[in-house]
Amino acid sequence: MKKTTITLFVLTSVFHSGNVFSRQYNFDYGSLSLPPGENASFLSVETLPGNYVVDVYLNNQLKETTELYFKSMTQTLEPCLTKEKLIKYGIAIQELHGLQFDNEQCVLLEHSPLKYTYNAANQSLLLNAPSKILSPIDSEIADENIWDDGINAFLLNYRANYLHSKVGGEDSYFGQIQPGFNFGPWRLRNLSSWQNLSSEKKFESAYIYAERGLKKIKSKLTVGDKYTSADLFDSVPFRGFSLNKDESMIPFSQRTYYPTIRGIAKTNATVEVRQNGYLIYSTSVPPGQFEIGREQIADLGVGVGVLDVSIYEKNGQVQNYTVPYSTPVLSLPDGYSKYSVTIGRYREVNNDYIDPVFFEGTYIYGLPYGFTLFGGVQWVNIYNSYAIGASKDIGEYGALSFDWKTSVSKTDTSNENGHAYGIRYNKNIAQTNTEVSLASHYYYSKNYRTFSEAIHSSEHDEFYDKNKKSTTSMLLSQALGSLGSVNLSYNYDKYWKHEGKKSIIASYGKNLNGVSLSLSYTKSTSKISEENEDLFSFLLSVPLQKLTNHEMYATYQNSSSSKHDMNHDLGITGVAFNSQLTWQARGQIEDKSKNQKATFLNASWRGTYGEIGANYSHNEINRDIGMNVSGGVIAHSSGITFGQSISDTAALVEAKGVSGAKVLGLPGVRTDFRGYTISSYLTPYMNNFISIDPTTLPINTDIRQTDIQVVPTEGAIVKAVYKTSVGTNALIRITRTNGKPLALGTVLSLKNNDGVIQSTSIVGEDGQAYVSGLSGVQKLIASWGNKPSDTCTVFYSLPDKNKGQISFLNGVCK
């Protein structure tokens, strides 16, 4: 028999379905001169049923790379596509009338208008569908039939800070936990914090609530502690239940806005963010500019309104200012409605005030020609309020709304009536990359009060001295192209008896070839506390990669205040180990006292099981040492998994037996010793892809596909299961009982004890084949034809120890 040499690498590149780097090669099989029937399987490998990893295309658009079962049909293979798979690919199932299924719930494609072509050589499945059976294209929201409520699980986020000061030997602690439990569509959440500052201990529970989505009516039901909607009235904390339209389920919806908190710290400081008196966030910051972004605020369950920011300086000074957190103009498309209903008890952080039961309802409806009408009520035994308003989408000029409110505050002696009106304006200028948001509310009479003001004033007459007359806020964001960008935030509260308080935060940023420049200005005034201060900061960052071959930056920062304080700060910042390690070393000199010098060191590490950090500061009179740790824990049916902090919506990655595999896009996130990890920052109701880096797989492990698509509902912990092959990777030479090698093109199927095919490979020259995931307990079945007699079972033995990546074995097929 004449033989032609073909390398094993080429054969496995063409036919080994588990290889994600495969290429297509073409051969003249006639040149092999094989005996009749010996190469039958080789030349028609696509007719052999089994599990194959394929690229799935619908009308020439790649939908996913996944493992599918292909069943044998006449002269071809037919993929097993379930109804869920077709929905996932964008097929409108309701348009496929009389759809038929086999016993394995696979759609019988021959009875549908859906056509397919399977190409075994390049591992692709081409689906073609007429436009009439395609779902409407929506770049945001996935089909609700594949929304995944996730697994039942207990989850916990934790964060702890510790600081020790040598002077006085004081220790301070701050801890925060976010326990939760998922059961079906229900989400139970809590946020609690504990702090010990200068021997003063304090524990707070910001909220505890249960929540679920109602996809049929695109709404969200909440029971427990939450905040009311801020569309018409000020957001207030309550304990009760609410039903709200959930816009995250709506295509092209108006997404929730979260503010960015910016400020300037003059020393090592603690920043606390509160809303309605509740502590929702606390962190330590070094001197200079700081920014608390959307990522830190989004998962804390805050309500729309005003965020109170306090900066506690090391020298005892305290900065206080507010950050407006307002909603855009209430402008809805024609026929679209939005509502919220709340019944509960007002939840006051200070027990000195009353907490009455109240009802609040709001309704917004979009009309033709860009008009929107809205109205709402607040009812309580000591207070009633009514609101009506309208908005107009004025096209290229933005959107404008007007609302009118009336309130009745009930006292022991009389009812006090008041009125207020408000104007909001939003504009996004695409041509100039400008975003403007303005909001102004004027209390037409002194007796007008919001719900919160009525609660406070009913118990304390001195509240009248702080009765608001108006409140104005503005947000401006302007991109300047190559010149950088500018951000401006302004908030002014005026009172009937005094000027009130004002805060202005302005910043400018510019980046040129890696060199970044940042200017920041903060002004805060308060006639109530008689606090006035202006802070200015200048920051310059220069990359040092070309000099050090590492990701490092040199920074200079100058901070000054209207109280004649000026600091010069010089430092080096670095990132290493694929962004897992960040570190910083800085020195500071105070202009007021040339001898007042300080040194700051800090570093943080993001790993598989969480994040840990340490900081050190030193000057002539004090020395501080601090540590912080944070992370997340999920307890599920398969055990307990530790990881980095869990976002509101996340995935539990399962790759059994594969430890140390890296999840792409998340620094430090790798599978643990069992093959589990946590992948956060998923977007609810949308297609999310979770990818594992195949180059990080340990020796003698393999995964059938590297990308998994999930569509979680809000708050879900979805399971992303990777099919793994753990065991010896071997080059095995297989012979028949007569000593002759298996024929070229024979298909090897590795089956587990349940008969499920784990992997397939093709026999090459001289009966050799590459097989992955051998453990000695699976069945290795060889097949070379379509008749039942054209199979045999391969018997082999594994070495006791495998020091290399590939074992070389011999096997006999009987």
From Swiss-Prot:
Q: Which UniProt keywords apply?
A: Cell outer membrane, Disulfide bond, Fimbrium biogenesis, Membrane, Signal, Transmembrane, Transmembrane beta strand, Transport
Name of the gene this protein is made from: sefC
**PANTHER family from the UniProt entry:** F1 CAPSULE-ANCHORING PROTEIN, OUTER MEMBRANE USHER PROTEIN
The family note in this entry says: Belongs to the fimbrial export usher family.
Q: Which region is the signal sequence?
A: 1-30
An MF annotation (GO) of this entry: fimbrial usher porin activity
Where do transmembrane segments lie in this chain?
Answer: none
InterPro entries per the UniProt record, alphabetical: Fimb_usher, FimD_plug_dom, PapC-like_C, PapC-like_C_sf, PapC_N, PapC_N_sf
- Originating organism: Salmonella enteritidis
Task: Give a yes or no for keyword Disulfide bond in this entry.
Answer: yes
Please describe what this protein does.
Involved in the export and assembly of the SefA fimbrial subunit.
Q: List the disulfide bonds.
A: C792-C813
- One Gene Ontology cellular component annotation held by this UniProt entry: cell outer membrane
* Main location (coarse class): membrane
The biological process GO terms on file are: pilus assembly
High-level lineage: Bacteria, Pseudomonadati, Pseudomonadota, Gammaproteobacteria, Enterobacterales
Q: Report the subcellular localization.
A: Cell outer membrane
Q: Which domain of life is it from?
A: Bacteria
Q: Does the keyword Ribosomal protein apply?
A: no
Q: Which SUPFAM superfamilies match?
A: FimD N-terminal domain-like
Protein's UniProt name: Outer membrane usher protein SefC
* Pfam families according to UniProt: PapC_C, PapC_N, Usher
Kindly give the membrane topology term recorded for this protein.
Multi-pass membrane protein
